[in-house]
């Protein structure tokens, strides 16, 4: 019983910490962004085995809603995320050419392994391969920025 409370308290603390951070300097952002872009993202040739169906797209949207919206917003474009502009490097817009240029295999690799120093956590072991591939499918079909509101956790 104490473990779930500890986990919830830790997650809440991590989310609230982001709300108190000052925006990074331009130099800091450039250095961290440069470093992030030097990371070799693997799995380039892997193909998404999850077929594009309404059911699989809904599963990807649901998994994204559970694991990704706290940082990336419902639309994948950080809408309503209060600390998005204070992260160093800034959280990427998941519809941006910089993100969408990745192959499906590379997107899965990023979700599996995370990216340091960006703060993107690794999900390997937390999510099944099918869940990750469904999230990748969802990332290819994100709604327009601001069209679906902001995460409920930040709207109060």
Where in the sequence are the language-model features?
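C-terminal motif of bacterial Sec signal peptides marking the signal peptidase cleavage site
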Residues: 16-18
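Electrostatic cytochrome c docking/interface patches
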Residues: 27-63, 155-156
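Solvent-exposed, polar/charged alpha-helical surfaces in well-ordered, non-transmembrane soluble domains
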Residues: 58-69, 92, 105, 109, ...
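Flexible coil segments in periplasmic/lumen-exposed cytochrome c-class electron-transfer proteins
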Residues: 24, 42-43, 65, 101-104, ...
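Bacterial N-terminal signal peptides that target proteins for export
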Residues: 1-7
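Periplasmic/extracellular electron-transfer cofactor-ligation site
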Residues: 24, 39-40, 55, 61, ...
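Short Fe-S-cluster ligation motifs
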Residues: 98-112
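Bacterial signal peptide processing site
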Residues: 20-22
């Amino acid at each position: 019983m104490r473990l779930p409370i500890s986990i919830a308290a830790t997650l809440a603390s991590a989310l609230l910490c982001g709300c108190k951070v000052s925006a990074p300097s331009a130099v800091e952002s450039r250095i961290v962004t440069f470093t992030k872009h030097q990371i070799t993202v693997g799995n380039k040739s892997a193909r998404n085995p999850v077929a594009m169906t309404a059911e699989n797209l809904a599963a990807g949207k649901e998994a994204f809603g559970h694991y990704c919206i706290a940082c990336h917003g419902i639309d994948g474009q950080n809408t309503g995320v209060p600390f998005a502009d204070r992260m160093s490097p800034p959280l990427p817009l998941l519809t941006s050419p910089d993100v969408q240029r990745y192959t499906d295999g590379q997107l899965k690799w990023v979700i599996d392994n995370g990216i340091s120093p960006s703060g993107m956590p690794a999900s390997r072991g937390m999510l099944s391969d099918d869940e990750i591939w469904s999230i990748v499918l969802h990332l290819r079909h994100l709604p327009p920025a601001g069209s679906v509101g902001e995460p409920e956790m930040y709207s109060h």
